[in-house]
Amino acid sequence: EGREPVIRFKLLDGAISFADLVRGEVTYDAKNLGGDPVIVRSNGIPTFTFAGAVDDINQKITHVIRGEDHVTNAAAQVRIFEALGANVPTFAHMPMLLDSDGGKLSKRLDSLSISNLKAQGFMPEAIVSYLAALGTSVDPKIAPLEDLATQFDFEAMGRAPVRFDLDQVLRLN
């Protein structure tokens, strides 16, 4: 067929379960994950799913906090952790962060980068305080970083996508 070979990770049949601090207990049937995941592309470069798991093992990561769009990756990564004899980290899949119009935020959209917001005069405390409350029912207010850290609760996080509202950050500023 003219295709270059890739390396796949054989997913054993059955349920794959893991703890998620936002979603609770998550279970996927390996048959419904779209087949055995590619772990090394035809150009020899490892995929995110594999490289992320190996990196987490090497760095002894205990918690993986990332976007909701990676929750199915976690199921395959659980099997990779197990196959490599490593502890499975605790996951927290946060709701998708959307722009003010409801579109998906892009890493390439520099206007909402932390460095760009700081350059526009936004105080770091305002940015962090807003982000700590985003996706919860908590009304954002300026607070010391230590307080935000001790009060943060993954279980208070909703699962619905949230919109980043620059006007709310401006009010905190």
Residues of each region from the PLM?
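Catalytic adenosine-cofactor/nucleotide-binding cores of aminoacyl-tRNA synthetases and other
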Residues: 72, 84-173
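Active-site cores that bind ATP or allylic diphosphates and position pyrophosphate for catalysis
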Residues: 1-105, 113
